[in-house]
Amino acid sequence: MKKLILLILLLGLPSLQAQDYFPAHSEVKTKQEVYKAFTNATLHIDATTTLEKATLLILNDKVVSYGLKVSIPANTITYDLNGAHIYPSFVEVFSDFGVEKPKRVSSSGRSPQYEPTREGFYWNDHIRPDTEAAQLFSYAKKSADDYRKAGVGIVNTHQSDGIARGTGLLVALDDHSDASKRIIDDRSSAYFSFTKSVQSSQSYPGSLMGATALLRQVYHDLDWYSKGNIETKDRALEALQNQRSLPQLFDAGANGNTVRALKIGRQFGVNYSVLGSGDEYNYVRELKQFTTPVIIPLNFPKAYDLSDPVYAEYVSLKDMRHWYQAPSNAKILSEHGIRFAFTTNGLTSLSVLRTNVSKAIERGLSESDALAALTTTPAEILGKQSEIGALKPKMKANFMISSGPIFDVKTTIFEHWVNGHQHVYEDRNTPDVRGEYTLNLNDESFTIAITGTLQKPTVKISKGDEKLTVKSSFSSQWLNLSFSDSLGQLYRIAAKKDNTLLKGRVVYANGNSTAISLTP
């Protein structure tokens, strides 16, 4: 009997131990949801709607409401913006952010390679629609920071390799989330180009004409394949077939290739959104025949140095004309009713993004069209206009807080909120001391010009045509200056912003001091 009882206890032991796997209900805790309200803001809901002294209310990663009179729940953290501007995050539609770079294949010899190297795929290695950016992606924190500083909070990225490049990935640039929250769509779009893959040495196509012919052949083969006319499974065509419902993006390049790509799309019923090269002003009449927005770069060419007559001979009239016309490209498209999105693709530094948009505005582009080209239009291209590109209820809480109008060169981006998470760049309470002031001391008049950034202003002092050497620092809202006039008289100044003035004291070399005001 004792042996029987012992046997029963031993048999029941595993089941008793297994109970520990399940968590006890006593450990479950209720998490209170905390709202965030941004009050007294100049709120840009989208490219055409702006509210003064407004409130934006968010919960977690979503916008709850906005307006002049918003009901704020009890469990809310409130941020008084004191007139600062809120803008939707910019959307980058054509990037390779965080995606593994393709590895260039080494040539095996001098004889051309005609056969493909990938079994079970299309007969040409440069057709790679099976590439998935989601499988090659690693969040690049430093690069994400550069994007956010420029105003970009959402990036559509892919591996820029091949004629058919596969699917892209839509990512929110949030350092405080993991992939489950950052990735908005792991199959956001399908990418194409006229450029061969660096991962293959296959010779064909060897020209733009060949690339165009190959792409047309792909669509003919896809149509034949999708009707079940081929028994052999082609993994590349299968992938392409599964991408037909995705937004189609095309990297066309220069010299009229934008129109060439659009014509291929029209032939096969594909609505490409085409990345051009900034010379679309040359093809306005042709572009007006198509309805999909074009994607235009902001990499305006630098002015040519023609001081060297030998070098000047190599600068063509075409190059000079493009240097002059490139900043007007967006305005010309807008005037002709051609919709467009801006891209950072091709910029050597993201820091010039807003500067170059400002140049386009100086050439006549409206600020609302410029903002739409960075927010609502790229969101529409990606079919995500109900989620990103604006700040309406149930949309993603992706926005930046700035000191003024976003395309003003003096404006500073204080913070960038992505997925409802704060990324701070400047102290919002820092007074803006920048400007040109006049200082009168001992019957002498000095001009003080303050430029630079909000946190690190740059100071220049002059007396008439004479430029004086100055040492300056800015800390805890105080501007400290030290300079000497032409007679060697030393002045040390400490001043603080007071409405439009800078008020403080000047200390002379003998130790005496007096109150001063720097007037704009």
Listing of model-derived features with the role each one plays in the protein:
Residues 32, 40, 102, 110-122, ...:
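His/Asp/Glu-enriched, well-ordered alpha-helical/loop segment
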